[in-house]
């Protein structure tokens, strides 16, 4: 059965893995001291979900620890999404999506995204993409969201290292597992997807950590050939 659905990871696959750790995380950390003391009702409601919410300093330390250790905490992801929204809207942040990935998304009809980052954060990222062809013009930002059929995160579908998450996604999309191609830079994610019957490709991008030998997956360096 041929592939009809493309499920894409984000960092290390369609954009540099450094974008999150060198741009998004530092931006969030810089805002954190004022964030934990915010009077914004929407932010306070998210902060209240952390056990340390009664002590702003302890809360800041706890959240920064989660960020530093890249913990996939749903509440943290929600908070980060809120902060990054402000950065994207102000123009302080633009996502450096690879040009070949942009062209791929324009060519294919059934493109879905699966990331540990919240659906909100995913939509923000793809809604504020640095235009590789017009980086110095007024059209320096692209909105790729119209090219994306749907989004999945750890809240909607589960953690990316669990095969049941991919089973849920396949069910939600409404196709057979073998019709879905999942592309990621993470071998363990690919193993989980493969266990669910999903087809897989390992993304090899500049700056990605070296992968183990004999990983057993087909690889792709650019999406031009897909």
Swiss-Prot record:
One of its GO terms (molecular function) is acireductone synthase activity. Pathway: Amino-acid biosynthesis; L-methionine biosynthesis via salvage pathway; L-methionine from S-methyl-5-thio-alpha-D-ribose 1-phosphate: step 3/6; Amino-acid biosynthesis; L-methionine biosynthesis via salvage pathway; L-methionine from S-methyl-5-thio-alpha-D-ribose 1-phosphate: step 4/6. The keyword Zinc does not apply. Its cofactor is Mg(2+). Its EC number is 3.1.3.77. Substrate binds at residues 115-116, 160. Pfam families: Hydrolase (PF00702). The keyword Cell wall biogenesis/degradation does not apply. It is found in: Cytoplasm; Nucleus. It catalyses: 5-methylsulfanyl-2,3-dioxopentyl phosphate + H2O = 1,2-dihydroxy-5-(methylsulfanyl)pent-1-en-3-one + phosphate. Keywords: Amino-acid biosynthesis, Cytoplasm, Hydrolase, Magnesium, Metal-binding, Methionine biosynthesis, Nucleus. Mg(2+) binds at residues 9, 11, 185. It comes from the Eukaryota. SUPFAM superfamilies: HAD-like. GO terms for biological process: L-methionine salvage from methylthioadenosine. Bifunctional enzyme that catalyzes the enolization of 2,3-diketo-5-methylthiopentyl-1-phosphate (DK-MTP-1-P) into the intermediate 2-hydroxy-3-keto-5-methylthiopentenyl-1-phosphate (HK-MTPenyl-1-P), which is then dephosphorylated to form the acireductone 1,2-dihydroxy-3-keto-5-methylthiopentene (DHK-MTPene). Belongs to the HAD-like hydrolase superfamily. MasA/MtnC family. This is Enolase-phosphatase E1. It comes from Zygosaccharomyces rouxii (strain ATCC 2623 / CBS 732 / NBRC 1130 / NCYC 568 / NRRL Y-229). The lineage of its organism: Eukaryota, Fungi, Dikarya, Ascomycota, Saccharomycotina. The gene is UTR4.
